[in-house]
Structure formats: C-alpha cells, structure tokens
Amino acid sequence: MTMQLGLALVLGVAMCLGCGQPLLRAPERPFCVLWNVPSARCKARFGVHLPLEALGITANHGQRFHGQNITIFYKSQLGLYPYFGPRGTAHNGGIPQAVSLDHHLARAAYQIHRSLRPGFTGLAVLDWEEWCPLWAGNWGRRQAYQAASCAWAQRVYPNLDPQEQLCKARAGFEEAARALMEDTLRLGRMLRPHGLWGFYHYPACGNGWHGTASNYTGHCHAAALARNTQLYWLWAASSALFPSIYLPPGLPPAYHQAFVRYRLEEAFRVALVGHPHPLPVLAYARLTHRNSGRFLSQDELVQTIGVSAALGASGVVLWGDLSFSSSEEECWHLRGYLVGTLGPYVINVTRAAMACSHQRCHGHGRCAWQDPGQLKVFLHLHPGGSPGAWESFSCRCYWGWAGPTCQEPRPELGPEEAT
C-alpha cells in the first residue's frame, strides 16, 4: 500500500500544540504522533536534518529526548524507585517497603521542578518496569521481589508463623507499591497540572506471542484483565494511559492487528475508571523490530499506527534509543525511512483523522470504528489527498461535547472536571 502525497499535504499538516492549550486537548487534534527518540545528535553532530515537523510528527525542541512536549522518567530519574539490579544489588532498598515515601516524594518534586517548566502541557511518562504493584503479577524474574518481601516480613514480624509472615509480606509490598505509584502521579499532577501523567506499559494485556499459531487469538490473558481491574486506583490517579504495542519478535503478520486491537481495547476499558470522561490513550510503538533492527514496513505501520487511529486512540508515541543517532550513516538511514515511509503515512493518517472528525463529529470528537471486529476500513486519505468514506466510524467526543456527532455543548464535562 503506497501513499501518494503532494507537497500541499505536507505543508498543510497542523501542529499538535496551539494557542497554549494542553497537548491533545486542543479540539482540532483528533490524533497525534509524537517522537520519543534521542535524535538531536543527527543535526548537532552529523549535520543530518530530520524534518519531523514537516512530516506531522511532534517532537521536543531540538529533538531532545526530554522536553516540554514529552518527557519519560526512567527508574533512576524520578524519586527513589526501589529495584534489584542484574546481579541482585538492591537500589533504594530493593523493595517498596524499604523506601521512605516522604524522601521519595521530596526528591521527585525537586526533579519535576528541575525538568519541567511550570506551564508544562506535554506527556509525562513514568517507566517503572522492574516489579508489578500487585503481588501476583511478580512472576519469573520478578519473584525476587516476593522473596525479598518475605525476608523483610521475617525481620519485622519474627514472632509470627510463616503463613502470617507471608500475608504480611504480601500486604506490605502491595500497600507500599501502591503508595509509591499513586502518590508520585498525584505529585506530578499537582506540580504540573496541565501535563498528561501515566505509567508506560500500563495497562498490561498478557497477549504476547509464544510461537503457537494454532490457538492465538490476541485476546488479553484473563489474569492480566483481573489485575487491571484491581489496579483501579492507578487509573484513577493517572491523567493518560500509555500501553505498549511493540510487535513481539516472530509474531506472524496475520496476528498483528489482533495483538494491537486487544491491547488498546483494554486501555479503553480502564480509561473510564475514576474519571467522568475517558483518559487519553497514547500507545507506545517502536520504529524497528526488537531483534533484527529492521524498520517497520508500510503494512506494519498500518497495523500499529493505523489501527490505533481507527480504534480512537489519542495518539501514538514512537520510541527509539541512541542507536538511531550513533553515526552519520545511521542518521541518514533514519532520515531515509522518515521521508520515504514513516512520514508520508503519518501525514496521511493525521489528516484523515482530522477530515473524519470534521465530517462526522463537527470537529468536536475523534472517529473510532463502530465495530472493532470488522477492521477493514482505516482512517486513510485516498491517493491525491481526497477523504474516504467514514460510514464505518462513530464519534468519541472531546471534553465538553456530547451527542452521536458531538454537536451538543456540555460545559459540565470540561477539562477541569475530567482531570
């Protein structure tokens, strides 16, 4: 599938930021694609310009990895996140119970003030992947956190029998983990209230690929769904959701759409928890495949970015590491992919989402598939730039609007109530 887009389309791409309104809450932006790749060195060190703005991709100033449009906080960059290193070394006590919540929040507040301007309106993504805040979610290598919690309970409650110590270990871990995650989000939202705060990879889905094609459906695992229901407090404390739609290595192309669809549908399900209006859902997607380093093909962009737009997501965040700007050759390689494949598709999808919004939703909502089970029609412009037929799409109204086509003003559903 080839997108034939003229210069007029490139020049006509609207920016995600405008009029000082928070990112993604400006009513004219039904779908955004954001750049979370540390590519500043391409221009600064090698003189290779990446025309992200012209291609409809929102990036930080100077294409820095951290900035006012998007900032991701890794485990050592916000507060005192406890975890075990690869060799078992405990950092910040290793487990949530060992961390002083007051000290954690004080350090996090200092880092937020230092990293984000007071008027920050972008995405604030917390990447804490070492443990799950629910005891049952810590299996495999994460069982180290259960073992350390049991040892903690034995020290703190030496007179209890082993079963009671296990109960104390579980309760202590879950209570401390919840406090760390919930209060960190609350702190961020208090200090930078116009930003969109949430944790990367949440909600989880458990529909990864394990090499068995005969019974793969793409549905989320029942245990993952149950854990997400238990994490009601996390969704209530968030102001955006950032699920991952990284295509698993070896996943056959026939299953790409189901894999992405069910991950996003689970995010839409929990996005309503604790909020009068659904939280924005922005899926994290990779530029390349994890094992091979091969860039996503046109069809794979359709099954990630295209499916996200057609399901009604607020946007997609494109992630990459320093390898993309490690040399002049890599920078030219990245530029070629941007200009030849990724950029034209992003322009097409974002303009199609805009056209559908205005045609079906009075410009006050985003289009989403009426029946996600019939994923035949995408938000694509035809070659030459003409809009498609949007009969397969219904409207998801922005804050402050309601009705089948988002034509009814509802001031009581304004952003201040919804966040």
Swiss-Prot record:
A single Gene Ontology CC term: endoplasmic reticulum
EC number: 3.2.1.35
Catalytic activity reported: Random hydrolysis of (1->4)-linkages between N-acetyl-beta-D-glucosamine and D-glucuronate residues in hyaluronate
Localisation per UniProt entry: Secreted; Cell membrane; Cytoplasmic vesicle, Secretory vesicle, Acrosome; Endoplasmic reticulum
Description of post-translational modifications: N-glycosylated.
Residues linked to a glycan: N69, N215
Tissue: Highly expressed in bladder, spleen and liver. Expressed at low levels in the kidney.
A single GO molecular function term of this UniProt record: hyalurononglucosaminidase activity
Domain of life: Eukaryota
Catalytic residues in the record: E129
Enzyme class at the top of the EC tree: hydrolase
Keywords linked to the UniProt accession: Cell membrane, Cytoplasmic vesicle, Disulfide bond, EGF-like domain, Endoplasmic reticulum, Endosome, Fertilization, Glycoprotein, Glycosidase, Hydrolase, Membrane, Secreted, Signal
A biological process term (GO) from this entry: carbohydrate metabolic process
Signal sequence region: 1-16
One matching Pfam family: Glyco_hydro_56
InterPro entries, alphabetized: Aldolase_TIM (IPR013785), Glycoside_hydrolase_SF (IPR017853), Hyaluronidase (IPR018155), Hyaluronidase-3 (IPR027260)
Residue intervals of the EGF-like domain: 352-407
SS bonds (residue pairs): C42-C331, C205-C220, C356-C367, C361-C395, C397-C406
Similarity-based family: Belongs to the glycosyl hydrolase 56 family.
Function summary: Facilitates sperm penetration into the layer of cumulus cells surrounding the egg by digesting hyaluronic acid. Involved in induction of the acrosome reaction in the sperm. Involved in follicular atresia, the breakdown of immature ovarian follicles that are not selected to ovulate. Induces ovarian granulosa cell apoptosis, possibly via apoptotic signaling pathway involving CASP8 and CASP3 activation, and poly(ADP-ribose) polymerase (PARP) cleavage. Has no hyaluronidase activity in embryonic fibroblasts in vitro. Has no hyaluronidase activity in granulosa cells in vitro.
Stated name of the protein: Hyaluronidase-3
